[in-house]
């Protein structure tokens, strides 16, 4: 891939993001580099720095905001996000179903929509910053305390009475929801998928983390946790969040049309310039404190009294001075003393890799190398489909067809692949069975075929029961329907809500067997498309007008509509 004349969006301008941008302007002439940071001050500083390095052909622009939030909340500071109504709005946003409107509300979608980058490089430490609760385990512990006080267990037959929802309970519940990284990361990746398809993003590279700098469960460092020693709950949560993100992106990598790469440094990423002065601990400035004379430590008194005595003995100055030390800033907004730096980068500990080396690996990956792409390595190491399994599949399907014929009962849907798959299989089966062959299904009058399909479902008791037994409704051409007592779609029914035409259309897309003429026409057009593609010799698909397999037909349809696994090299 050539980088000249490309628009490149870099999300995150910490050590790695900045180093990648510097390498880009040194090694190529992109049309535009967009730097997105979490804070406006950082954006202005990084863009100004890069403008001094970039050539005249490269435009440097910036944007800022919370990359995980809905766009209308992206510029809210963390203190503003502490507002109760804002936090509730965030929780509702992340936990609502991923409809198209929801996906287009996200900051990542808006960024790609606005700047139309050819390449996106995400260098944010997502595992550390994706949630909106400082201590998820404490928050969930508070929720657990509330759960213990609700009385007996809740069942469908006898729901337990929940306590009145006080503001405190609402806050604890909201905080617990915002501590869940999976919905937040899922919304981000799903919105990224939508944006990559809508705006033709050519490649996405994620720079991520092992969670422990390449160390294992024996890692002694808590990354600032003062409540635990060794591998803390906070660190385990970070590792889990990173794993969720990697798995989501790996599946996006297997999606047709999505070129996704993953680069992970497995060591402490280098450092900035050495300095002397105020420093931070756990992200906060360290205030100077002292206790110049010993105080008695009483075994029979609370520790809080001792702390109070210490503050009386050494009263704080009006302008509390900052503690100062020789230190060096490193990744994750951390600063390290000389001794800490020596320890953490020693052989056998985190060790270290320079930010320039990480940037070089990212650019190599961007240019097409797979040396540092973990997804390529995972694909290579994973066990793929085999010839033996294909032979056994053929034998198993033959046995199933023989049993179907012996019992004179079609085996179409069990419901275990979801209502939409079940709906598609049943519609195709009914359509082709009513027509008599694939050729007739493609060419018959749509109105006549809809009538024949409706008659088949009314007359074939076993087929009808197969649909209704798994919660599918059957929508007939004359505004009538067939339905059992339990419906899979919609999953929740409002007893007071009136059914609208829009509801029916929505439910029929999700999981109602739709035998109306418009849906029949949809399948006829797609069957013709399959026939044209197969006739062109582009596939090994056996197009037999009478001995067809409805599962194979639907698989072909999914392949043509982008709902198939990505084939390596394509």
Curated annotation (Swiss-Prot):
<keyword id="KW-0560">Oxidoreductase</keyword>
<dbReference type="GO" id="GO:0017000">
    <property type="term" value="P:antibiotic biosynthetic process"/>
</dbReference>
<dbReference type="GO" id="GO:0016491">
    <property type="term" value="F:oxidoreductase activity"/>
</dbReference>
<keyword id="KW-0045">Antibiotic biosynthesis</keyword>
<comment type="similarity">
    <text>Belongs to the LDH/MDH superfamily.</text>
</comment>
<protein>
    <recommendedName>
        <fullName>Beta-methylindole-3-pyruvate reductase</fullName>
        <ecNumber>1.1.1.397</ecNumber>
    </recommendedName>
</protein>
<feature type="active site" description="Proton acceptor">
    <location>
        <position position="306"/>
    </location>
</feature>
<comment type="function">
    <text>Involved in the biosynthesis of the antibiotic indolmycin, an inhibitor of the bacterial tryptophan-tRNA synthetases. Catalyzes the NADH-dependent reduction of beta-methylindolepyruvate to yield indolmycenate.</text>
</comment>
<keyword id="KW-0520">NAD</keyword>
């Amino acid at each position: 891939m050539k980088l000249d004349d490309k628009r490149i969006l870099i999300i995150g301008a910490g050590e790695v993001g900045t180093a990648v941008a510097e390498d880009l302007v040194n090694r190529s002439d992109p049309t535009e580099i967009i730097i997105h940071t979490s804070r406006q001050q950082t954006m202005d500083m990084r863009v100004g720095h890069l403008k001094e390095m970039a050539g005249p052909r490269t435009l440097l622009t910036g944007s800022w905001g919370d990359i995980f939030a809905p766009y209308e909340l992206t510029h809210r500071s963390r203190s503003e996000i502490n507002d109760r109504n804002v936090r509730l709005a965030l929780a509702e946003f992340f936990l609502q179903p991923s409809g198209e409107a929801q996906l287009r509300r996200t900051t990542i979608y808006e960024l790609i929509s606005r700047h139309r980058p050819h390449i996106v490089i995400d260098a944010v430490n997502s595992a550390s910053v994706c949630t909106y609760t400082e201590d998820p385990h404490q928050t969930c512990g508070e929720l657990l305390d509330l759960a213990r006080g609700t009385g007996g267990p809740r069942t469908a037959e006898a729901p337990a009475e929940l306590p009145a929802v006080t503001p405190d309970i609402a806050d604890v519940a909201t905080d617990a929801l915002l501590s869940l990284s999976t919905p937040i990361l899922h919304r981000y990746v799903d919105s990224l998928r939508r944006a990559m398809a809508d705006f033709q993003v050519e490649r996405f590279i994620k720079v991520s983390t092992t969670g422990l700098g390449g160390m294992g469960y024996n890692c002694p460092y808590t990354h600032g946790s003062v409540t635990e020693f060794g591998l803390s709950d906070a660190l385990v949560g970070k590792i889990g969040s990173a794993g969720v993100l990697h798995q989501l992106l790996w599946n996006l990598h297997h999606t047709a049309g999505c070129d996704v790469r993953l680069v992970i440094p497995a060591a402490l990423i280098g450092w900035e310039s050495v300095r002397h002065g105020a420093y931070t601990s756990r992200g906060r400035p360290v205030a100077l404190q002292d206790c110049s004379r010993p105080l008695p430590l009483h075994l029979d008194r609370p520790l809080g009294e001792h702390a109070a005595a210490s503050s009386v003995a050494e009263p704080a100055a009006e302008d509390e001075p900052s503690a100062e030390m020789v230190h060096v800033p490193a990744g994750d907004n951390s600063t390290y003393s000389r001794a800490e730096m020596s320890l953490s980068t020693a052989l056998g500990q985190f060790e270290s890799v320079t930010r320039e080396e990480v940037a070089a690996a990212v650019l190599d990956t961007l240019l097409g190398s797979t040396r540092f792409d973990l997804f390529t390595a995972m694909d290579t190491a994973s066990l793929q489909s085999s010839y033996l399994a294909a032979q056994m599949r053929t034998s198993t399907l033959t046995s199933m067809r023989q049993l179907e014929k012996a019992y004179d009962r079609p085996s179409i849907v069990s419901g275990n692949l979801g209502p939409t798959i079940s709906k598609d299989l049943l519609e195709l089966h009914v359509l082709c069975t009513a027509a008599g062959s694939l050729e007739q299904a493609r060419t018959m009058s749509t109105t006549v075929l809809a009538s024949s399909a409706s008659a088949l479902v009314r007359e074939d008791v076993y087929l009808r029961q197969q649909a209704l037994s798994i919660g599918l409704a059957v929508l007939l051409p004359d505004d009538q329907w067939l339905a059992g007592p339990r419906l899979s779609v919609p999953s929740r029914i409002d007893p007071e809500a009136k059914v609208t035409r829009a509801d029916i259309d929505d439910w029929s897309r999700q999981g109602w067997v739709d035998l109306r003429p418009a849906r029949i026409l949809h399948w006829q057009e797609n069957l013709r498309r399959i026939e044209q593609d197969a006739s062109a010799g582009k596939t090994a698909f056996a197009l037999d007008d009478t001995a067809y397999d409805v599962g194979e037909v639907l698989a072909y349809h999914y392949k043509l509509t982008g709902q198939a696994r990505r084939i390596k090299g394509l």
